From Swiss-Prot:
<dbReference type="GO" id="GO:0000785">
    <property type="term" value="C:chromatin"/>
</dbReference>
<feature type="compositionally biased region" description="Basic and acidic residues">
    <location>
        <begin position="210"/>
        <end position="219"/>
    </location>
</feature>
<protein>
    <recommendedName>
        <fullName>Polycomb group protein Pc</fullName>
    </recommendedName>
</protein>
<dbReference type="GO" id="GO:0031507">
    <property type="term" value="P:heterochromatin formation"/>
</dbReference>
<dbReference type="GO" id="GO:0022008">
    <property type="term" value="P:neurogenesis"/>
</dbReference>
<dbReference type="GO" id="GO:0007385">
    <property type="term" value="P:specification of segmental identity, abdomen"/>
</dbReference>
<dbReference type="InterPro" id="IPR016197">
    <property type="entry name" value="Chromo-like_dom_sf"/>
</dbReference>
<dbReference type="GO" id="GO:0035186">
    <property type="term" value="P:syncytial blastoderm mitotic cell cycle"/>
</dbReference>
<dbReference type="GO" id="GO:0006355">
    <property type="term" value="P:regulation of DNA-templated transcription"/>
</dbReference>
<feature type="region of interest" description="Disordered">
    <location>
        <begin position="1"/>
        <end position="22"/>
    </location>
</feature>
<feature type="compositionally biased region" description="Basic residues">
    <location>
        <begin position="1"/>
        <end position="11"/>
    </location>
</feature>
<dbReference type="InterPro" id="IPR000953">
    <property type="entry name" value="Chromo/chromo_shadow_dom"/>
</dbReference>
<dbReference type="GO" id="GO:0003682">
    <property type="term" value="F:chromatin binding"/>
</dbReference>
<dbReference type="Pfam" id="PF17218">
    <property type="entry name" value="CBX7_C"/>
</dbReference>
<dbReference type="GO" id="GO:0000122">
    <property type="term" value="P:negative regulation of transcription by RNA polymerase II"/>
</dbReference>
<feature type="compositionally biased region" description="Basic and acidic residues">
    <location>
        <begin position="146"/>
        <end position="155"/>
    </location>
</feature>
<dbReference type="GO" id="GO:0035064">
    <property type="term" value="F:methylated histone binding"/>
</dbReference>
Amino acid sequence: MTGRGKGSKGKLGRDNATDDPVDLVYAAEKIIQKRVKKGVVEYRVKWKGWNQRYNTWEPEVNILDRRLIDIYEQTNKSSGTPSKRGIKKKEKEPDPEPESEEDEYTFTENDVDTHQATTSSATHDKESKKEKKHHHHHHHHHHIKSERNSGRRSESPLTHHHHHHHHESKRQRIDHSSSSNSSFTHNSFVPEPDSNSSSSEDQPLIGTKRKAEVLKESGKIGVTIKTSPDGPTIKPQPTQQVTPSQQQPFQDQQQAEKIASEAATQLKSEQQATPLATEAINTTPAESGAEEEEVANEEGNQQAPQVPSENNNIPKPCNNLAINQKQPLTPLSPRALPPRFWLPAKCNISNRVVITDVTVNLETVTIRECKTERGFFRERDMKGDSSPVA
C-alpha cells in the first residue's frame, strides 16, 4: 500500500489516518507503466476508486507494497511486449497469413498438374498480399478454374492423339506427293556422260524407269522397277516391288542416302559400279535371293555367246562387264550382297537402258545405265563418237 496526501504530494500516510484530512491514505490498485527519469525509477500508479486521469508517477520509494512491483514485472515478462495499441495492431496483422498459407498448401496438394498449381499458388500469394478481403472468393475461383483445366486435361489425350494422327497422315501425304513431283521432275534429267542426247530424245525411254520413293506407312525406301524393251521383240521385265515387310531398318535407309549422294558425285568416273551398288541395297528382295542366284549362274553361261551374236560390232563392253562381274565389289554396307544376287534374273538382253530415280529426303538422284552402247546412245552418235560404255 502506498499513501498519498492530497494536500502534501509524495508523503506517506497511514491506513487508519482518517481523522487528519491532510494525510489521507489512498490504496494503489496496480502499476501501469515504468520509467526512468533523471536516474530515478518511477512507476505510474492506478489508484483504487479513482479515475485513470488521476494516475500519477510515483518514485519507487513511495510504493510500500513490494508485491505491486513484482506483479508488474511478471506481467511484463509474460506479455513480452509493452501493452500499446499500435504494437497490438502490428501483432494482429500477421494472423490471417497462416490461414492463407494453409489454403495455398491444400490447393497445391489437390491439384493434379504440379506446374499449374505452382503458378496459381504464386499468383494467389501475390494477390493475397494485395487484397486480403477477397481471399476466399479468389480461392474459390481458382478451384473452379483448376476443375475446368483438369476436365480439359482428361479430354486432351484423345484429342492430342487425333490431331497427331491427322498431322502425321497429312505430313506423309505431303512427303509422298513432293517426292513424286521431284521424281517426275527429274525423269528428264540426263547425266554429263550422255552430253549428246537431249530430254526430247529420252522421252521414248520414259517407260523404262525404276523409282525409289518414300513409302507412305513407314517412311523407308522402296524401289519400283518398270522396264520396257528398246525394240518390239524384247519382252518387258516383270515388275518387282519391295513390300514394307521386306524393307531394311532405319540404319540401312541412312546408308542408302549416303550411297545415293556418293553415286551423284562419282557418276562421271564410276557410273557403272556405284549405281549397281546402290541398287543392291534398295532393290533386293529377301525372298527371291536364292532363286536369282541359281538363274544367274545358269544364264551367265548363255549370255556370253548371245551377246556377240546380237552385237557383233561392239564386243569390248561385254568383256568389261564380265570383268566387273568377276571382281568382288567392296561392301558399302553390312548387308551388301555380291553381284549374283542383285543382277537381273533374266538378263540375256544387253542393250536395255535402265533409269533409276533414288529419292531420299525429298532429294532425287537419276541414274541411267546400259550394258552396251547400243540403245544407250543414238545411232548417229555412235557413228560420230565411239565412246566407251558410260
